[in-house]
Amino acid sequence: MSSRLTKKSYIIYGLGVSYFMIDQIYNQWLSYYYLPPETEKNLVPLLKPQYLVLAFIFARIIDAISDPVVGFLSDNSKSRFGRRSIFMLAGGLPLGILTIMYFYPIKSSQMATLIYLSVVGGLYFTAYTLVAAPYNALIPDLASTKEERLNLSTMQSTFRLIFTGVAMVLPGILISKL
């Protein structure tokens, strides 16, 4: 590792990818929660499959719009807190709250649940983009050499793998306790 970035810097940067754990919870557990398998007798489907797909499509359209907007704003920011940090700070808390909101839907009707999931999903992906896009753009900002970029990327990948494992196991344990 280079002398400019310390081992501690690499580890702290790698830990920053913890936001990815939230995305894995979304990817692996949200469909299960809203549309559990028929073998799960104590879990009731919250949405018809076609409504779940519509909510996911709406959320991803919002994601496709927010990605380049946040990227442009982050690249051109002149914030005194750093051009990337302000976005990550702005998105972090909403991302956590919106993740929790996914699992507390309005259950009055299929349409209400569809609208709720669509709105929460669109906001979730906007908050996710506020955290993830600037974080991933930090590598060229932090590293001055090819070796540093490679080391930062390796740390990010290592922690991403660890956080994926946590996201695969922990929610299953929590769901089984419900």
Predicted regions and their residues:
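Membrane-embedded alpha-helical bundles of multi-pass transporters/translocases
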Residues: 1-178
